[in-house]
């Protein structure tokens, strides 16, 4: 407004039509702002009578030309009237607008209220409208809000609140199962499972015409798999846990009824994904017909490598937590099944396919062996005792123990077995019938590994105790004292442990004393 007045002043005090129009618009805006300020002021302060005169400017009016001096006789603005209101109002604008803007900004920050579940809804909107995963939506939301906070400092406080809520949602967001199921992802996942249930129901009446539904089923399975991978795992859990895992049990029955290889492979991928969502899924599958069905499928279709690998992986997942198996399951997972696994490992073809088969089946063998606490009833050890040699099994197990890898650790769930590879070796060397499966060269490598681990591990570490126990079994059930590989180094290590007086070393010292007592003729 001052610019318009300055232009008019330089033009002899004459306003053009365009300038007058712009002034009217600006004055209307000023009236609106003033009314808002009065409303805010009336809520926080006692009421006062409005001034009849406009606020005087805080600085002198612009210097007028000689023409304007002659026409305006005085410098102070006149009492507002219909003819002079625009000029006086315009002169007072700079101070009034600044004050009012400051008041509005301060008040608007106080009045910003973030609605409940705002962050949850924002993350879901990002998922729906962009197709990104639930995890990625956190990154996107944080990036946007941080950018707004940086570029618009006046709203930094509410942006900080939003960032804090995002962190809380990521780390400890708590929602009822009902609210999770009602989310967009929850509804989509439930819809996909309902479609699978319909296919399962139709499978009992399948005819040649229904085989045309294969592309549709595959698309639905792929869509469901994508949803489960991208969605919030809490949402997936909530949907799965409904009615005692009804959707999961229905999918297992559908797998049992479905014989098309392409659909079976897709279902196996689905089971693998579900195992990673909730530990309870593994418990449910362990007590279902799925393990027996997978064991039967593997033995009936040995030429289908892809089906073998997927079935083996899902079985390894189901056995990974070492939960007790239902007794009736041993009718299908019997000696015949273990013999099949070992035979496939030892007769695996050369090349990449053979390597994949060995890796997968050895992992399954280790996972299955976790479930046996009684050595006499251990199906895996009973079958190995009848084998003359297990070269591939031995080499793979030695590689795993040397690398300190456990192929059975697939999830972060609690497990009943700390290390499947170490447990397998403890079982093998617990009997002379199985300890002879390892060649002398393998034994020497194993002794080097045991010495390294026992030396490096700290007192109180459960693994050190297990390695010491394994060393004692090697001394007991092999011909170690015929070659005495690394004997002096092992003796020094054992004597050092025997002298440890920490409470954490008590169990280890007990094992060492048993070794010295049992083999006193060899140790000085």
Located regions from the model:
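Intrinsically disordered, low-complexity regulatory regions
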Residues: 1-200, 469, 478, 490-524
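Elongated alpha-helical scaffolds that mediate protein-protein interactions in large eukaryotic proteins
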Residues: 12, 133-138, 148-340, 350-359, ...
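Alpha-solenoid helical repeat scaffolds
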Residues: 219, 266, 293, 310, ...
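Structural signature of alpha-helical solenoid repeat scaffolds
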Residues: 225, 272-273, 316-317, 366, ...
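Long, well-ordered core segments of solenoidal/helical folds
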Residues: 248, 294, 298, 341, ...
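Extended alpha-helical scaffolding segments
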Residues: 298, 307, 439, 444-515
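Amphipathic alpha-helical interface segments within eukaryotic helical scaffold
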Residues: 346-350, 356-453
